[in-house]
Amino acid sequence: MKRISALCALAIVVASFTQVTSSAAERPTSVKGCAKPTAKAHAPATLKQPTAVDKKLAKTMTINTNCGVITIALDPAAPQTVTNLATLARSKYFDGTYCHRLTTEGIYVLQCGDPSAQGNGSPGSWKGYKDENLPANKILTYPAGTVAMANSSPNTNGSQFFLVYKDTTLPPSYTIWGKIKTGLPLLLRIEKVGAYKVDQTSGNAYYTGDGYPVQPIEIKSVTVR
């Protein structure tokens, strides 16, 4: 998934969605069981980038969100990626951030990992790192349950990643670094509520197949072991 720029700042986007709900009240605007988010978008932290692969790779990542828990089995076939993401998790880089992108038409992913919630943020001072473990299957490249890195071009990985909740075919350009073990039903519930963008002229929000999740998804904490 390419990194994208949000149409406006997070606070403006969230506030504007009330304008679409009044004219589309028949559509749900929240996922049952989700708590009210409290995080604020912020600039990505500046952290030291790992220069070598961890001698003992983490095996599991647990993402605690305001809507529930997502558990990921980490793939040793992407050792540098797993090392870098584990470093970010241990530094609490992801804590108090939002998943900023949901796609529901043709491509089925929830994208997270940018503290600015604008789709173009990565750790300050980090250089893009190499792609690893690219899909071997050129027909169904990213099946449901896959977790992969977002990037803007080859070898530009940072902190953004996407969770695939339905079978998705994309160019085989995105590092696969994990598989969802628990939490896939939650992602399907998030999909049903949908995504939106904001019209820059009117300021009104509208439903779209590629935008900000209608149900805000806040990452409370990320742990690895």
Language-model features, listed with the residues they occupy:
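Cyclophilin-like peptidyl-prolyl cis-trans isomerases
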Residues: 2-4, 8, 13-225
